[in-house]
Amino acid sequence: MTMEDRIDELREKREEALKGGGEDRIASQHDKGKMTARERIDYFLDDGTFREFDQFRTHRNHKFGMEETKLPGDGVITGHGEVDGRTVFVFAHDFTVFGGSLGEVFAEKICKVMDKAMEVGAPVIGLNDSAGARIQEGVQSLGGFGEIFRRNTEASGVVPQISAIMGPCAGGAVYSPALTDFTFMVRDTSHMFITGPDVIKTVTGEEVTFDELGGATTHTSTSGVAHFATDTEEQALDDIRHLLSYLPQNNVEDPPRVEPWDDPERVADELEEIVPDQPRKPYDIHDVLNGVLDEGSFFGVQEDFAKNIVVGFGRLDGHSVGIVANQPRVNAGTLDIEASEKGARFIRFCDSFNIPILSFVDVPGFLPGTDQEHNGIIRHGAKLLYAYSEATVPLMTVITRKAYGGAYDVMASKHLGADVNYAWPTAEIAVMGPQGAVNILYRDELEAADDPDARRDELIEEYREEFANPYTAADRGFVDDVIEPGDTRNRLIADLRMLKSKRKSQPDKKHGNIPL
């Protein structure tokens, strides 16, 4: 056989592999409004940068008629490429090949990509579209899942891991995305659940649709399992590229800086008009973020889950920062179980990858109620406290209005190790809100008053003027300065420059025991 013959043979084999499950199954994928695995990779990566691993690998199973079944690439496409010129590793389940079911070789290919990503120090992107375990391979499939889960855990905090759910993801397969840093879902076409609607109906009698049980809306607004939901696969892939622009390649690199387009000395006078004079009147914390961050740079995370706290990425003078902010428009910005978990997880991600954290505080306390207490608000609220306390990245805090009680401590206070703490003149920093304090401190006087309501209003105003202000905390050094809102942006940019070389180490230990 000549070299020309051998090259022709190679090209034929490669062409066969590129067809996946064949034209009929590719057409079926398109009919469902879904791209194929290769189309997703080609769309996601910079043009011409994808280099595939193990294109010719296939299963080793000879039971249940599998010896007669050819599975190109064993149903998964793996390799590396570039996003905006930076290396990423990617795997994509190929639903056209045996439903993208996971077998032994399938798992080995994914593990190889994950191992290489950790060696190189580059993000891993998983494009999930799989029917689940390959039953024909039995326990070998379960072993494959376990190998992937272990690598997800080992890679956590080492390289960014991002999952996109672009079809079914059921049973044990759901745990790999759950172990990654961010999960994207596509409305109407992607689903995640451990037990499906049929099993639930058989066991409990409950009837539920796929979307109600594990659709994108369910997991972004109710369970919090997913971080982003998009209308199309293309939008999901575009958003992943955008997310990567804020992130470093690994845990020993700093996040990338883009060329700034917004004046670092810009004075945001509009911030003076945002916080209402009435302490109970809500406002949108996004208006504050838009005035402080580089224009148009905020990228929200989990926007539909636990809306009383806002988290996401932004830029200050081109530098990536993580944002954690109470949202006064939702439940007055109180902290509850879901908000505490959402904030804690995001803080720990930022700390893992050297992303400074900027916190905006307007919190009247933790949400009261038997439901919160019985479901463990003490334990869950402690997660947020724990996350801030263990963080070693630069921590900058701005108190815009309320900072009451234990919630003041929890929200990146100086006592937890924040580097820079500012308060606006509208800040009310106190052990509790004026109304509650007055009811306790002046109970006897109020009971004896001719007009208790009028006297209560007078005492509340006196308490607010004397105690619920930023100056007592400033006198104690609990805030570094009381600043005009318009100066917030340029002060924080200067502080970020100052903190760039921050080095903080924690006591030697295997790992902490966060109150899970």
From Swiss-Prot:
Protein name, UniProt field: Propionyl-CoA carboxylase, carboxyltransferase subunit
Residue intervals of the CoA carboxyltransferase C-terminal domain: 263-509
Function (record text): Part of the propionyl coenzyme A carboxylase (PCC) complex involved in propionate utilization and in the production of the poly(3-hydroxybutyrate-co-3-hydroxyvalerate)(PHBV), which is a water-insoluble biopolymer used as intracellular energy reserve material when cells grow under conditions of nutrient limitation. The complex catalyzes the carboxylation of propionyl-CoA to methylmalonyl-CoA. PCC is also able to catalyze the carboxylation of acetyl-CoA.
Effect of deleting the gene: Cells lacking pccB and pccX genes accumulate a high level of propionyl-CoA, which would then inhibit CoA-dependent enzymes such as succinyl-CoA synthetase and could partially inhibit the TCA cycle. Also affected in growth and glucose utilization. Cells are unable to produce PHBV and show morphological abnormalitiess such as a decrease of PHBV granules.
Enzyme Commission (EC) number: 6.4.1.3
Annotated S-S bridges: none
Pfam families the UniProt entry points to: Carboxyl_trans (PF01039)
Signal peptide: none
Family of this protein: Belongs to the AccD/PCCB family.
Alphabetical UniProt keywords: Ligase, Lyase
Pathway this chain belongs to: Metabolic intermediate metabolism; propanoyl-CoA degradation; succinyl-CoA from propanoyl-CoA: step 1/3
Gene Ontology CC entries for this record: acetyl-CoA carboxylase complex
Organism: Haloferax mediterranei (strain ATCC 33500 / DSM 1411 / JCM 8866 / NBRC 14739 / NCIMB 2177 / R-4)
GO molecular function, one term: propionyl-CoA carboxylase activity
Keyword Nucleotidyltransferase found: no
Reactions this protein catalyses: propanoyl-CoA + hydrogencarbonate + ATP = (S)-methylmalonyl-CoA + ADP + phosphate + H(+)
Keyword NADP: no
